[in-house]
Curated annotation (Swiss-Prot):
The keyword Acyltransferase applies. Its EC number is 2.3.1.180. It is found in: Cytoplasm. It comes from the Bacteria. Catalyzes the condensation reaction of fatty acid synthesis by the addition to an acyl acceptor of two carbons from malonyl-ACP. Catalyzes the first condensation reaction which initiates fatty acid synthesis and may therefore play a role in governing the total rate of fatty acid production. Possesses both acetoacetyl-ACP synthase and acetyl transacylase activities. Its substrate specificity determines the biosynthesis of branched-chain and/or straight-chain of fatty acids. This is Beta-ketoacyl-[acyl-carrier-protein] synthase III. The last Arg residue of the ACP-binding site is essential for the weak association between ACP/AcpP and FabH. The lineage of its organism: Bacteria, Pseudomonadati, Pseudomonadota, Alphaproteobacteria, Hyphomicrobiales. Belongs to the thiolase-like superfamily. FabH family.
């Protein structure tokens, strides 16, 4: 059987780092308040000339180089983002152009913070269906452009950045010891769309709008939804939490991460946490955390890695991948 194997990984962050203390002159908050409630200490904020496309392209180049490939080897560019450069064409097409790719196809996928999980799952289906051999999967965001910088409950939470992986078709044996994606489960429930959304859009207000969130409601649903979809992935493979080498969750809030790991009985030392230095980068969150753990030597070839994320909609999902 065909498996989608991770061939390369890369990331990119804006130059500007904004620490918690930098918010004290903008809104009523403090470093202690932010750290205690979120675990965030700093985040990167896009500056002049740094866009979703430029960050996504930089992460993509790094992933392709890490894979030992050329841009011309890529069949599909799949970008997960909620902050595209333009309403259309897709920012994935712009990244395709930046990379000099003139073959294959490219499109955007929008599932907010779950975007990268949705994108990996979609890429896996294209690979296993024979429509693509190598897929560049990117999560890139510039949420700083849709924040209400007078709302202290949201503006302190988010950062900008991009992460990317190259998935490649490889022959597997149908075993959980195979390298590549072993299971993926996606969910959504539109009944919760008012709990996390942006209050603008082309067909309604003709504006970009700002992010709005009912933080307590999101927290209340997050742990249960995340653990349920992970359990479905375990059930599909016969694997358990004890088999996991690394848990790479969406980096939204350390309290949600800790509660999810505890409910799943995953040891703290197996949890990859970068929310302290990146904040919530939405669709870029999981690949940025992955890239960090690969770069520092934690995630190695053959490791079983559990990915998960939850975002506005609500949307949520989980992926089990053998590195």
């Amino acid at each position: 059987m065909i498996r989608s194997v991770v061939r390369g990984i890369g990331s990119a962050l804006p130059k500007r780092v904004m620490k918690n203390t930098d918010f004290e002159g903008i809104v009523e908050t403090s470093d202690e308040w932010i750290v205690q409630r979120t675990g965030i200490r700093e985040r990167h904020i896009a500056g002049e000339g740094e866009t979703t496309v430029s960050l996504g392209a930089a992460a993509a180049r790094a992933a392709i180089e890490n894979a030992g490939l050329q841009p011309s080897d890529i069949d599909l560019v799949l970008l997960a983002t909620s902050t595209p450069n333009n309403t259309f064409p897709a920012s994935a097409v712009a990244i395709q152009r930046e990379l000099g790719i003139t073959r294959g196809f490219a499109f955007d996928l929008q599932a907010v913070c779950s975007g990268f999980i949705y994108a990996i799952t979609t890429a896996d289906l294209y690979i296993r269906g024979g429509m693509a051999r190598r897929v560049l999967v990117i999560g890139a965001e510039t949420f700083s452009h849709i924040l209400d910088w007078t709302d202290r409950t949201t503006c302190v939470l988010f950062g900008d950045g991009a992460g990317a992986i190259v998935l490649e078709a490889a022959e597997g044996h149908g075993l959980t010891s195979d390298r590549g994606i072993l299971a993926a489960n996606l969910r959504s429930d539109g009944n919760h769309k008012e709990k996390l959304y942006v209050d603008g859009g082309p067909s309604t207000t003709q504006t970009v709008g700002h992010l709005r969130m009912e933080g307590r409601e999101v927290f209340k649903h997050a742990v249960g939804m995340i653990t349920d979809v992970i359990e479905a992935s375990f059930e599909a493979t016969g694997l358990t939490a004890e088999d996991i080498d690394w848990f790479v969750p969406h980096q939204a809030n350390k309290r949600i991460i800790d509660a999810s790991a505890k409910k799943l009985h995953i040891a703290e030392e197996k949890v990859v946490i970068t929310v302290d230095r990146h904040g919530n980068t939405s669709a870029a969150s999981v690949p940025l955390a992955l890239a960090t753990a690969v770069a520092d030597g934690r995630i190695k070839k053959g490791d079983l890695v559990l990915l998960e994320a939850m975002g506005g909609g609500f949307t949520w999902g989980a992926v089990l991948v053998r590195w």
